[in-house]
Amino acid sequence: MPLSYSAAAAAAPSPLAARSRGLLRRPPRSSPVVVRCKKIDQLRAVNGIPPYAPVSNRSLLSPVTLPIIRDANIKNDTRLRIFSGTANPSLSQEIASYLGLELGKINIKRFADGEIYVQLQESVRGCDVFLVQPTCPPANENLMELLIMIDACRRASAKNITAVIPYFGYARADRKSQGRESIAAKLVANMITEAGANRVLVCDLHSSQAMGYFDIPVDHVYGQPVILDYLASKTICSDDLVVVSPDVGGVARARAFAKKLSDAPLAIVDKRRHGHNVAEVMNLIGDVRGKVAVMMDDMIDTAGTIAKGAELLHQEGAREVYACCTHAVFSPPAIERLSSGLFQEVIITNTIPLKEDKSFPQLTILSVANLLGETIWRVHDDCSVGHEPYSSLDID
């Protein structure tokens, strides 16, 4: 039986399906895999879900030719403005290209003492402004830049200001696990609100409860549909598939993911953590012998948890192990662990820009630009963003 989505997921309508067509190709496995498409064609929706867009290999903010899927008359909507911070300009450009818009003109620079200067170089008075800026490493600098961008838009009389944060830094500091600790996620939420944002758009928060830290509306979308689409295109027999949660805390996410992949069985790696960035795998709950194991998590930081989990899966007889995540933080020694031969493939998205020295042959990068671009348009057009697959994976 071929690998496919569940019937419920396959039946879910998509606004992209009626407008998109084209060809997706993968380069040879001898180099890091980046999903690309013919620039003259539009992307094809598979099973009624949004396709994965090409990932630009440009590191600087410059025009790129990408397929425009959204209606061309968006260009006539002069109230919609998209500005990019310096954290991930290539993703911002892809989002703007999806919407058929040009990025807003903005001047961002650093003074000699490290202070950040932001000046909007076009009017935003009465406009619906979206600021694309993940707070990825260096988290403090990117966060401060976002706050100053929000303040600049507020003082320039923007009607609505939405902070589009593909990766929300400090999301893991969402509770007090020990006495006298800070809940930094709540502090950052307060700062964004006080700076003047009217709304926040985030992708794959570490815990959904963190949405409650904001006193303004939060649109929470999941990057997993992009990964699901890619996995469904691979020739993996559904009877051989098992989805693995690398820890107990990710069971709900992995269960929702497994349900979409032909309702695959679920396994759980039980671990004990002895300090920050250190994980110890204890045992496996479930059967992976002779199976293709797909490990799903929201992020990979040092890769300690997922690498030790992969070792355990191989010991328990797994035939192949895939690692999937939305946010590739990849702090040292993540690259060494992920490229050590434990994984058949490491599948990530581009919510965080990846430097060239962090690439390796098993790496596949998928783009969330279409996902975020469609959500931005729905927010601007006062449409629901709760339509599958844009926000919900039925995670409970």
Curated annotation (Swiss-Prot):
Residues 290-305 are annotated as: Binding of phosphoribosylpyrophosphate. Its EC number is 2.7.6.1. Gene3D superfamilies: 3.40.50.2020. Keywords: ATP-binding, Chloroplast, Kinase, Magnesium, Metal-binding, Nucleotide biosynthesis, Nucleotide-binding, Plastid, Transferase, Transit peptide. Residues 1-36 form a transit peptide. CDD domains: PRTases_typeI. It is found in: Plastid, Chloroplast. Mg(2+) binds at residues 204, 206, 215, 219. One of its GO terms (cellular component) is ribose phosphate diphosphokinase complex. Pfam families: Pribosyl_synth, Pribosyltran_N. Binds 1 Mg(2+) ion per subunit. It is an enzyme of class 2 (transferase). It catalyses: D-ribose 5-phosphate + ATP = 5-phospho-alpha-D-ribose 1-diphosphate + AMP + H(+). Its main location: plastid. It comes from the Eukaryota. One of its GO terms (molecular function) is magnesium ion binding. Its cofactor is Mg(2+). InterPro entries: PRib_PP_synth_CS, Pribosyltran_N, PRibTrfase_dom, PRTase-like, Rib-P_diPkinase, Rib-P_diPkinase_bac. One of its GO terms (biological process) is ribonucleoside monophosphate biosynthetic process. Belongs to the ribose-phosphate pyrophosphokinase family. This is Ribose-phosphate pyrophosphokinase 1, chloroplastic. It comes from Oryza sativa subsp. japonica.
